[in-house]
């Protein structure tokens, strides 16, 4: 998907060549993703990823076979080869490392310009973008990543507001304001942004410190990070911490 995007942006034919090759490989060997994945928290599905890539390759090449794959996944309610349901009834997860169905849904809607396809996207976003004064918390484990992921897809949908019928830009701006410090604590969640930025993000190389069991002078675990990881987003609060 990223190579197809790069081709669309920069016109490098080699990017497109390898985007097609990787797509074909992934489609041919789908079971590798889940049969060979022994990590308990690892990705066990692949259809969303291939659909995401198919959408970009359709935009890059105009080859209808890519659109067919995307449409089949997005319009199916059944279980695919990997056990992953299609998205006929909508999207149920923010864009993340393990599920890119939202991205695929937006691509399909952009391509088809269909009101019903946009509805798959906006129905989900309507359920999340409910308040400009309340921090949106999808999950307390790293809530900020999910917050900004929903912001991103909400802003893309707003870009196509003539087709989607929705404009979430005000909501997204309010959510980003809270992340950057416009909240009851005055703290922001972005490292290196200002004096109220996080000083102790969990990042091994940025810490600049090492474990020192003999207390020979190495800074303790609670010391500020030795290197500023500018732009990094820390975990984030619960849904009520910024109230």
Regions found by a protein language model. Name each.
Residues 36-39, 86-90, 130-142, 159-161:
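Acidic, serine/threonine- and proline-rich low-complexity regulatory regions
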Residues 1-88:
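Catalytic cores of extracellular degradative/oxidative enzymes
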Residues 1-9, 47-72, 95-131, 140-243:
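Aromatic (Trp/Tyr) and acidic
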